[in-house]
């Protein structure tokens, strides 16, 4: 009956029912494939055909603490996450108002002061990327490495990974006033959105 109704023999199973003497414990697994059934597609490992980007228009204003800036960052991340954005893109030197927290009149020292917050911003924004399920492009921040200052932006993936890109083409102002050095390579990053 089953074979005449398009059931297919999938496999023979040994010791399926050991107490059945007539079959010697064997069973036949049959499968009927419904041609009208479409299985639900997996949301994992799917190539996206559209990507939603959220560009943050950041108002430069006075901030009195890193926490205050991070609170504003989280406001935008939360809003863009509600819109199901794949990426939140922050502007270059979005944390620059924190240079006002130092009494340094020397611009080189002020940018080095600002670089002291970069790791905290990177870590906090990486946690937000995971919490809000959105990839965050941090906008550039100063980074000190081997006593040199670089202008670096981070890609905080929603799975917790963090990639970085150093600005290659430094503006004359950055080079002259902040003594920022340029990076020497372009990175290409794989994300869950392409």
Predicted features and spans:
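A short acidic, glycine-rich active-site loop
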Residues: 1, 108-123
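Active-site catalytic loop in hydrolytic enzyme cores
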Residues: 127, 143-194
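Active-site beta-strand/loop signature of hydrolases that rely on acidic residues for catalysis
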Residues: 53, 72, 77-107, 129, ...
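Surface-exposed, active-site-proximal loop segments in enzymatic domains
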Residues: 98-113, 150-155
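Beta-strand-turn-beta hairpins that frame and shape the catalytic cleft
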Residues: 44-53, 188-194
């Amino acid at each position: 009956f089953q074979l005449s109704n398009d059931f297919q023999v999938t496999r023979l199973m040994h010791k399926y029912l050991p107490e059945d003497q007539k079959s010697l414990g064997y069973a036949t697994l049959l499968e009927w494939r419904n041609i009208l059934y479409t299985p639900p597609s997996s949301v994992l490992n799917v190539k996206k055909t559209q990507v939603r980007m959220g560009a943050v228009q950041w108002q430069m204003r006075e901030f009195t603490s890193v926490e205050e800036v991070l609170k504003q960052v989280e406001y935008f991340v939360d809003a863009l996450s509600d819109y199901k954005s794949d990426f939140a893109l922050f502007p270059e030197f979005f944390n620059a108002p924190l240079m006002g927290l130092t009494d340094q009149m020397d611009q080189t020292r002020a940018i080095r002061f600002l670089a002291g917050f970069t790791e905290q911003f990177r870590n906090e924004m990486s946690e937000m990327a995971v919490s809000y399920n959105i990839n965050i492009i941090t906008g550039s921040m100063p980074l000190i490495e081997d006593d040199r200052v670089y202008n670096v932006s981070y890609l905080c993936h929603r799975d917790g990974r963090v990639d970085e890109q150093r600005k290659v083409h430094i503006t004359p102002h950055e080079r002259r006033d902040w003594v920022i050095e340029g990076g020497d390579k372009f990175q290409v990053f794989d994300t869950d959105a392409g």
